[in-house]
Amino acid sequence: MLDEHILKEMKLSFQLTEQRELASGRRKPEKPQHPPAVPKKKVISKVASNPAKISETMIQKAQMESPKKSKKNKTAGAKRPLSNNVSNPDSSPSQKRLKKDNTLPKKNPVNKSSNVAAKKSAATSKSAKLPIPKVHSINELAPKKTKVKTPNKTKEASLSKKHKVNGNKSSMKVVQNGKVVEIIGTAAETSDIEMNSLDDWSEEDDYLIESDSENDVVEEIDETFLKDPKIFKVKCKGPEYKLSDILPPFEHDEYQPLLLDGDGSGTVRKIKVFKSAQEETDSDEDDIDYEPEDSDDFGSEEFDSEESDSEDTSSADYDSDGDFYSEYSDMEDVSDSDSEEFGSDIFDTDDLDSTYEPPDIEGFFDHPPVGMQREPLIIEEIFDDPPVEKKQERIEQSSVMDIVVKNLSSVPPKKESEVAIETEENDEVSLPEVVTPEKENYLQPSDVPFYRNPQANPTELSVFENSLKSNHVLAVIKEDLEVYGTLVLTLLCGQISVNGYRARRQEAITIYSPKGLNWVSISPTKTKKPVKDEVNWEELNKNFTRAQLDRIKTSFQRQTNAIVLLHRNTSAQQLVDTFGKHMAQNVFPLVNSSNRPFGQSETLLHCLIQSSDQSRTLQVPQVWNKLQMHATSRIIVAGGKGVGKSSLLRYLINRNLGQFPSMLLIDLDIGQPEIFVPQTISCTVIDEPLLGPGFLYNRQPEHAIVVGHTNIVLCAEQYARAVIQLVQNIQNDAKYSNIPWLINTMGYNKGFGIELMALLVDRIRPTDLVQIASPIPINNFDSVLDRNSLSQIKPIIYSAEEFKINEIPKYTLHKLISAVPAREKGTWSLSAKDMRYSNLLARLSSCLTGNAKSLTDCQPLGVSLESLKILHPTSKNYSREELIRGMEANVVYLCHHGAGLPQCLGIGVVRAIDYERKELYLVPAMPLQKMSLVDCLILGGEQSLPQGFLRDQGQGVSSSVPFVFILDDSKSSKSIQQIYHRAPAFLGVPANQRN
């Protein structure tokens, strides 16, 4: 008698055999193979020298695993006839491999006798586009098994989980006569795959790659496949094939595939995963992440080894998420600046790590919770070790690869419909690009200009001529262009408009168009009469050849075009380098001349230029042009967060600079100031256009006062005192009386926001108030900001006598709708925290003069501690000694202490403090001419020195700063991220009911 454990092992063996039979499609699931009865005694001889007897069940098992068929099954395994009338005689598998049979599965059974060449020609003529393998939808984890019928309809094969139909795609590979065939279909065409995927293939000829035995596959694939295999690939509707040669796979270990067993798991070389940012959004418009369920670029968690190995996707195609902040991620304060939104009660997106992997839980992404978004990420070489046990099997000396493009340069003929579509596309010249048919129908989320797809939107109409002697580019602008980077533009002839500013001839204007904000647009303006040719061609001939100038003259049309001279913004080189060091995102571009249509011009300019489709630039509503401005205009711009107050301010400044030589910008936003540093309010005379964020110009304000916080809830009274004093200083200065005022306010529209607005209107006495409304209700005030509404406000926070509202003046109320363009899915944008961080980096870059690359390269200024007054911005509970020690290696505000609150002149970095000599060494980020006025230092409060300055101290410093916690892989401004939790009731809408 056999032992009990031996019987258990045998039962387990039969169960595994049955599972393999079902998974490989050799048996129907309806007819399970029952394990044999308990064998009799003496079935297995106890004598080692005598051969063991083989039971009938063992013979049946061997026959099932053998590729040879018994006489009983020969009819079911017979090869499908070449046509309906011609039958193929039975033969063994080895004999069939000697014949050159190019029979391939066809959607139409009549065409099954065509050879490989005919099929290749048909597939090539049908489309010139190369199919690119896609990963399936991640949210559809429930597999759908595809059942395949044999030719005589007597036997059904159930595909393994590898061939599931997941969402938009289903994929399968089959070895046939030394060829590898891959079929890819869409979810909408599942019926085509079910009917035509495997029903034309016999079980003796064609073998699935997913063999359950290593010997089965090796024995049944002939030598032709190992030496010179051919690869086919079938697209969605109907079988189309691409044939090309690949190298012998057994010579390259990295090409050896890892098979998948019944559970669909497998070892992959490169896969796509998703990083979830748990954010609560108020509108679909503000969702900046991908929605993978609508895109073919995203797939399920059940990855096929063939697809994974063949994907040619790099992580560089997607933006790094190391510094990814959404509009809703900044939870530091209730009243932050424009782009900040109320949101995430769980965690800040600053804490997301780029190596995040979703947990391996079934149904994890089936129904994502409200606010849960996904961000694609490429992780390469996840599993380098070969699989063990029964999970996967490795085929030795064999390889499977996807389509290999043999000749990219050869363009097959196109159909008439495709020729008609591409006639318009050929108007623009770009580098050769492989495009899938799905890519022609709609814009993929990854088709974002400049930093996603550098070949997108090339401009052929405009003409660019590069100087051989300098970094100048002479251009004829014929259509709207958008810019990514910074450059200096000089108008030579014609008329152009740059974000509302009409450039004057021979005037050099500086453009800043960083990533994360709307691109700056350069648009030629049509004229009624041809403009005069006032270009100094002789002067241009010093940098350009005669042939180049002749091409410019020939292509220039006087009524519609403009001639401009572009050159690199060398004065901003330190600023660009600082952003490159301390920002994970490429706020300014990394120019690569090899893959851009105008790479040489962009290399000279260190800036990317392309034709604008007006989807990523500022679109000015007509009502904006109806806002009239006079010399005595006092215009307050109010609205919630992210409604476009700064964009409107810059447009009004740019449009009216031709009428007024200068204007006064009063910036009352302590979270996201337009000109000066955060935690301050200021006023600045503007006499040049703001063609980009104002803080990148590093302008010095006329007056500035330190508030000391970015959250007005924590400094409400101090903020009001600072505003009252600043307005009094402006009103007492006669030079500001005859120029227009533009007042930028905070985006704090809840809580006591309307009470604060009433106080501002009472003190400033405006002539106009522009209220910008957002489609997101939470970003709007609870009532209209007219005179009657503000007059009925009963103060609660500002109830003291010094904040008493006397009488609300009369003013004109302009109600506008937000003109902020819809954000593209998956694009990175500057959040409020990013804006403050960028503002600080821009200001600190002004310290780096000459050849200085770090703060340690700058010569500090020494000053006696006895001559300085040391203050804390929001508290008086600290001693002088504590404040002095807190300033070391940190940012401080450089102020002049006079009557009232101290006047802020700029910022600086305390390099060191000599306690024995009582001297302080300072690196100022302000003009040295005003340093003689500094007699007071105020601690930076929340504004600390970015960590990158402590980590990268220059080549002359060999040791780290003592007592400083440094993360080598961090580029953020703080080592420990602060997470703020806000109750959903604060927003007035339950978390599960938000849009």
From Swiss-Prot:
Name the job this protein performs. Answer: Polynucleotide 5'-kinase involved in rRNA processing.
Q: Where are the transmembrane segments?
A: none
A molecular function (GO) term:
polynucleotide 5'-hydroxyl-kinase activity
Q: Name one GO biological process term.
A: cleavage in ITS2 between 5.8S rRNA and LSU-rRNA of tricistronic rRNA transcript (SSU-rRNA, 5.8S rRNA, LSU-rRNA)
Q: Which domain of life is it from?
A: Eukaryota
Mostly located where?
nucleus
Biased region (Acidic residues) positions are 279-354
Alphabetical UniProt keywords? ATP-binding, Kinase, Nucleotide-binding, Nucleus, rRNA processing, Transferase
Q: Where is this region: Disordered?
A: 18-173, 271-359
Where does the UniProt annotation place the signal sequence?
Answer: none
Record protein name field: Polynucleotide 5'-hydroxyl-kinase NOL9
Q: InterPro entries per the record? A: Clp1/Grc3 (IPR045116), CLP1_P (IPR032319), P-loop_NTPase (IPR027417)
Is ATP-binding given among the entry's keywords?
yes
Q: Name one GO cellular component term.
A: nucleolus
Q: Family, per the entry?
A: Belongs to the Clp1 family. NOL9/GRC3 subfamily.
